[in-house]
Amino acid sequence: MTSFGTPGGRITPTGSQRTVPGGKWSITEGDAQAIVTEARKAFFVMAGVLAVLWVIQIANWADSYHLTLNYGIVPRDIGRLPDIFTAPFLHFSWGHIEGNSGPLFIFGFLAAYRGVKKFFAVTLLVIMTSGLAAWLFEPANTVGAGASGVVFGYFGYIMVRGFFDRHVIDMVIGAIMALCFAYQFTVLLPHAGIGWQAHIGGLVGGIAAGWIFRDKRPRASGKTASAVTAARPVAGGTVPTRVDLPKKPGATGMQ
């Protein structure tokens, strides 16, 4: 957000007839198919979000950015508090929206590819936390706007989601994103004309979202997963690798 002064983790195949132990850290074939489906949805959702942002930007530019001035965040103005929900869609210049569009699409897609419904809940939370941080702590007589607070929210969510959901792939993605975009943390420090308060608020909201919206579904453990009985071919047929021993008449247990 920018402010301006105002005047276990291996893939284990499963099917209808068998379950392979993988524990809480495994990803089943069904999970993988669901991820692919949700990833397609995530791509189109983020493409739609960017399209909306750029349409708003064109209208805003044509109106000399009065939309930003009228619907951006004005710190500690009670009457402007609802503007925390409109400010992320508004920018101050073409360079401003261009700088936010790439990270917004990448982080938004990664935040959404495991479930678009959950993504919308995460988005609402980080909009509120980043907007409230800007409204409470940014300097007086300024207007704050821009999607960067939401970007930092997605960033925080992606970094911790894998740990809370216990998905190794998400943990790897979070680590890679943290390493590749570590320079972004410099924007959390105070800079003139930069709404770093919104960035911190978004980051905190994203981390909180990772915990609040973590996957609470029970996952099969290696101790409870059913065993797979295999058969190996031999001349004349197959010999099972496990058989039941016949009991003697009258036997009541192991001899």
Residue map of PLM features:
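A detector for small-residue-rich transmembrane helices and their helix-helix packing motifs
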Residues: 2-250
